[in-house]
A protein has these predicted regions:
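Short juxtamembrane and helix-loop transition motifs at transmembrane-helix boundaries
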Residues: 1-6, 25-32, 51-61
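Intrinsic N-terminal pre-sequences and regulatory tails
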Residues: 1-11, 111-129
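Trp/Gly-enriched beta-strand/coil motifs that build multi-repeat beta-propeller-like domains
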Residues: 4-12, 22, 37-48, 81, ...
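Membrane-helix boundary elements
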Residues: 12-32
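Transmembrane helix interruption/hinge and helix-loop junction motifs
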Residues: 28-35, 84-89
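A low-complexity, Ser/Thr/Gly/Pro-enriched, surface-exposed linker/loop concept
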Residues: 35-68, 101-115
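Membrane-helix boundary connector in multi-pass membrane proteins
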Residues: 77-94
Length: 129
């Protein structure tokens, strides 16, 4: 269960995959696709390497992923000011960065709590002991 007012980490991961895919798609639609496509790929790679439910490679923990999220957010924000980017692509990039910032800010990065095994009744057919 996530902390009050925070999103669960699995939801954070799904949102990052969507945001990364959107940034990649925005880059591929622009006249100069290099910068937005690289930023979208960076977001997707950052999401794929975390040790969490939807992590593909599970190389880093949640604490390090939180730091990497802020680094990726900074890179994405600086990339919005890249020279030679047309106005429409820049606006889409900026909106995607805002969504990513909200996702990062409102996520519960605490480690998953281990599930407690429930004791099974000693009597058959589920009758009370």
């Amino acid at each position: 269960m996530a902390a009050p007012g925070k999103r669960s980490f699995w939801l954070h991961q799904l949102a990052e995959y969507i945001v990364g895919g959107a940034m990649l798609a925005a880059g591929l639609q622009s006249p100069k696709p290099l910068v937005p496509a690289l930023v979208g790929s960076l977001i997707l790679i950052n999401t794929a390497i975390v040790d969490a439910p939807f992590g593909a490679f599970r190389l880093v923990g949640r604490r390090l992923h939180r730091i990497l999220d802020y680094i990726v957010l900074g890179v994405a924000l600086v990339a919005c000011a890249a020279p030679g980017t047309d106005v429409a692509t820049r606006l889409v990039q900026l909106l995607i960065v805002i969504v990513l910032a909200v996702v990062v800010w409102r996520t519960d990065y605490s480690a998953a709590k281990p599930k407690v095994k429930q004791l099974v009744s000693a009597t058959p057919e589920g009758k009370a002991d």
